[in-house]
Amino acid sequence: MVLVATLFSLFTVSLCRSIPRSSPSSSPYTQATDLKIHDPTVINANGAYYAYGVGEHIVIHQAPGLAGPWKQIGSVLDKDSIIPKGDRAKPWAPTTIEVKGTFYCYYSVSNAGCRDSAIGVATSQSPGPGGWTDHGAIVQSGTGQGSDEHPFNEVNAIDPAVLVTGDKGHLVFGSYWSGIWQVPLNEDFSSVGNTTGLNAHHLAKHPKTERVNSQDQNPDPLCRDSSGRRPVEGAYISYHAPYYYLWLSWGQCCDYDPNNLPPSGEEYSIRVGRSESPHGPFVDKQGKELTQGGGELIYGSNNDVYAPGGQGVITVETGDILYYHYCESLFFRGLSEARLGYSYLGYVDGWPVIREAP
């Protein structure tokens, strides 16, 4: 028994050492949960926690607390999305908010590596399954209504998040290509307002211009970017006075081969910039604008966490909590086994830091 335990310990140490880290191993351990989920959004409503993630018709999970136990209770949509493009059965990267008693679930439909995409919205009077109405697309890129207008003619319209300031909504979205953008929502929160001129705000862009042969060779112009891959997506904006914080998922999100992982620091990680305006410009600690490739690394691979991303922030009695999906370094199985984790946030000189649990 001692020999088995020793061999297991040696195996564990060896495996964990083989997983590259972009954050120090001294980083506080993630608060792990039993929920397997990809690109989560978490809300607290009606005395319970709800998590929405990628899956058949946008799966809904419920728990008495953020730590769980979590159980799947149904889905947002009762059939495929009414948007006629992309993976209509399994919409991506949902984000759910509540405004004046109505719940809005924004979601993406697309195909991997292409920007023929759309963001849709469904509404309900309850955060749980049943009673949701799918209103279809509110913005599109690649093809479809409005896709030839700025900024949709240069973006990939996926990964929605919504910032609410007063009675106004701001749709934040984007992945690769020209990066992250923000446009105003109308009062109904189910349609987009005027996006011309200064109403469309460019928030972030990845500086990398790596060329990928498979992308260059793709005959579909909507599935290649002649300037190279720019891996930034999954944006989210939170507020902690006096700053707005733009959170980004930075680096390679998917298709991890445990025998050929990307170089350390090129896998998913969570970065942030701040601004006194909800529209930016957002800068990192060095004052570099996120549209120029800036971004402060807040949480990356460490300890048993590999490639955290798909993040959001939820505020509880003890303060702000950063939640995300991550892959487990131990017994690495890749993104298909990603689970929900969370970390407590503190603020030092106006910058968020990961801290120990209170």
Curated annotation (Swiss-Prot):
Belongs to the glycosyl hydrolase 43 family. GO terms for biological process: arabinan catabolic process; xylan catabolic process. The lineage of its organism: Eukaryota, Fungi, Dikarya, Ascomycota, Pezizomycotina. The keyword Hydrolase applies. This is Probable arabinan endo-1,5-alpha-L-arabinosidase B. Pathway: Glycan metabolism; L-arabinan degradation. Keywords: Carbohydrate metabolism, Glycoprotein, Glycosidase, Hydrolase, Polysaccharide degradation, Secreted, Signal, Xylan degradation. One of its GO terms (cellular component) is extracellular region. The record marks 159 as: Important for catalytic activity, responsible for pKa modulation of the active site Glu and correct orientation of both the proton donor and substrate. Residues 1-16 form the signal peptide. Glycans are attached at residue 194. Its EC number is 3.2.1.99. Pfam families: Glyco_hydro_43. It is found in: Secreted.
